[in-house]
């Protein structure tokens, strides 16, 4: 009933555009990185059917990496692109576009945490686990130890707060905005992404600067801007998903607003975060800070603008034309792992050599 009421209002929905006062950038390696990312996803059996492969091609995750990390070295940029395609696919297949909870949900999510904690894959691995191990081992080689742990902690919180998101969808009505914001801050996947912003520019920020209260506020504002803007941009598709569909817009609608008014309320929140980020970034960079911290703040700006430009110019992930086919992944959610394990034997050998 909740979904049907929302769907009835979608045909006349107007989606606002967001702007920020700094230019976008894009790595000149974008197309090369995109092509290598597709090859890597193929080698790790992430593209489960031709239909799924075509979806990934039109989504352009490599372009997202190139826009959000324009100054990254080629090796780091490649592993980030590979991470992004892995993250979006597993988030869709494990959480968003399947039933709210399945028999495999806990096993899938704990396997992702175990790769971070133990640096090995399970036997047999779940879907995407060997690809995830490969990403983590490459990042361990490229990042300082503490910098990798920032990334890892963000991913652990993604996997664990996914359970809170599932619990929210098992309720007859959603939790309120405050609780949702807490869940969204971690299920968005933005914390692992922003944790790489310094290394992709001028090098890893020391802990004393990274954990400064103002710097963490900037990180949180970046997360909010991207996550809440995405709640608007992905609304039409998410309402058609079989499981997860509640977000900031639908929660506002649950409280009595029309869906259009709920979009405008959410957009106002996004613009307020953008204004707050701009003011605080100016204040922090006016202080005597390290080059690495300047690089981190630049990296946060790249992420905000890069994401907005990716949605506006590159990706078909949220395109109306593909909503019906892309919103429901239940037909893809259980690849035959016995076949997967046989075809992954060579991948297992190559990743184990990196330990």
From Swiss-Prot:
UniProt record, GO biological process: isoprenoid biosynthetic process
Query: Record's superkingdom?
Result: Eukaryota
Keywords in alphabetical order: Lyase, Magnesium, Metal-binding
Q: Which residues bind Mg(2+) 2?
A: 96
The residues the record assigns to binding substrate are: 184
Q: How is the cofactor bound?
A: Binds 3 Mg(2+) ions per subunit.
**Motif (DDXXXD motif) spans which residues?**
91-96
Cited Pfam families: Terpene_syn_C_2
Q: Which family does it belong to?
A: Belongs to the terpene synthase family.
The function of this protein is: Terpene synthase that catalyzes the conversion of (2E,6E)-farnesyl diphosphate (FPP) into sesquiterpenes which are important for fungi-environment interactions. Produces a mixture consisting of 9 sesquiterpenes including gamma-cadinene, delta-cadinene, alpha-cadinene, alpha-cadinol, beta-elemene, (E)-beta-caryophyllene, germacrene D, nerolidol and an unidentified oxygen-containing sesquiterpene.
Q: Report the PANTHER family cross-referenced here.
A: BETA-PINACENE SYNTHASE-RELATED, TERPENE SYNTHASE
Domain remarks in the Swiss-Prot or TrEMBL record: The Asp-Asp-Xaa-Xaa-Xaa-Asp (DDXXXD) motif is important for the catalytic activity, presumably through binding to Mg(2+).
Designated name of the protein: Sesquiterpene synthase MAA_08668
Species of the source: Metarhizium robertsii (strain ARSEF 23 / ATCC MYA-3075)
């Amino acid at each position: 009933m909740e979904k049907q009421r929302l769907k009835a209002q979608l045909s006349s929905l107007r989606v606002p555009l967001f702007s920020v006062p700094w230019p976008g950038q894009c790595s000149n390696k974008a197309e090369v990185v995109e092509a290598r990312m597709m090859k890597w996803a193929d080698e790790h059996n992430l593209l489960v059917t031709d239909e799924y492969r075509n979806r990934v091609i039109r989504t352009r995750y490599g372009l997202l990496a190139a826009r959000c990390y324009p100054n990254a070295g080629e090796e780091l940029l490649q592993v980030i692109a590979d991470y992004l395609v892995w993250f979006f696919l597993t988030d869709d297949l494990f959480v968003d576009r399947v039933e709210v909870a399945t028999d495999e949900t806990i096993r899938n999510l704990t396997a992702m945490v175990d790769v971070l904690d133990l640096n090995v894959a399970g036997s047999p691995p779940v879907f995407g686990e060997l690809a995830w191990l490969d990403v983590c081992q490459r990042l361990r080689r490229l990042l300082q130890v503490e910098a990798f742990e920032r990334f890892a902690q963000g991913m652990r919180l993604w996997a664990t707060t996914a359970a809170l998101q599932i619990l929210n969808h098992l309720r007859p009505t959603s939790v309120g905005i405050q609780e949702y914001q807490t869940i969204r801050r971690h299920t968005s996947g933005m914390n692992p992404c922003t944790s790489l912003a310094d290394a992709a520019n001028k090098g890893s920020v020391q802990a004393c600067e990274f954990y400064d209260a103002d710097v963490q506020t900037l990180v949180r504002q970046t997360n909010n801007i991207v996550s809440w803007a995405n709640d608007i941009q992905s609304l039409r598709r998410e309402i058609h998903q079989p499981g997860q569909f509640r977000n900031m817009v639908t929660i506002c609608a649950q409280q009595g607003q029309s869906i259009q008014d709920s979009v405008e309320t959410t957009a106002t929140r996004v613009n307020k975060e953008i204004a707050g980020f701009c003011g605080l970034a100016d204040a922090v960079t006016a202080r005597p800070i390290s080059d690495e911290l300047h690089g981190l703040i630049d990296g946060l700006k790249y992420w905000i603008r890069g994401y907005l430009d990716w949605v506006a110019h590159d990706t078909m992930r949220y395109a109306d034309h593909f909503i019906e086919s892309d919103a429901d992944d239940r037909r893809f959610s259980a690849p035959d792992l016995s076949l997967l394990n046989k075809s992954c034997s060579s991948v297992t050998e190559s990743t184990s050599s990196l330990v």
